[in-house]
Amino acid sequence: MINNVVLIGRLTRDVELRYTPSNIANATFNLAVNRNFKNAAGDREADFINCVMWRQQAENLANWTKKGMLIGITGRIQTRSYENQQGQRIYVTEVVADSFQILEKRDNSTNQASMDDQLPPSFGNSQPMDISDDDLPF
């Protein structure tokens, strides 16, 4: 059997990072994934997909991403169930992500000014050098 999922979408909220009693990282997040077609009004609808990630990748996801970022994930679909406080059995279908990739640059506008100060001066005003090629072996 094959159970592979590949999604590209935007985070609808910041990743929620928790730890199990045995100190295993668990990240939950929601991806908004645009559909490939437009509705009758000409708008593109989106699906909002619940996802979970575990261990080191979960910590990396929480540390490096934020709401609104475009990311890609790979993983599998998984169904689980639990009993709520009213005693009802609740079934949940979610994507268990194995890996992620950030698909856009991080917003570093706050660091941009300090980076510009550290860049070397432009060479746009310099003159070309006259170098003789008589000594070249080819």
UniProtKB/Swiss-Prot annotation:
Alphabetic keyword roster: DNA damage, DNA recombination, DNA repair, DNA replication, DNA-binding
Motif Important for interaction with partner proteins in this chain: 133-138
GO MF terms held by the record: single-stranded DNA binding
Region (Disordered): 107-138
Disulfide linkage: none
PROSITE patterns: SSB (PS50935)
GO terms for biological process, alphabetical: DNA recombination; DNA repair; DNA replication
Cellular component annotations (GO), alphabetically ordered: nucleoid
InterPro entries: NA-bd_OB-fold, Primosome_PriB/ssb, ssDNA-bd
Gene3D superfamilies: Nucleic acid-binding proteins
SSB domain span: 1-104
Highest taxon of the lineage: Bacteria
Entry-linked Pfam families: SSB
CDD domains: SSB_OBF
Function according to Swiss-Prot or TrEMBL: Plays an important role in DNA replication, recombination and repair. Binds to ssDNA and to an array of partner proteins to recruit them to their sites of action during DNA metabolism.
Family annotation (NCBIfam families): ssb
Oligomer and partners: Homotetramer.
Designated name of the protein: Single-stranded DNA-binding protein 4
Provenance organism: Streptococcus agalactiae serotype V (strain ATCC BAA-611 / 2603 V/R)
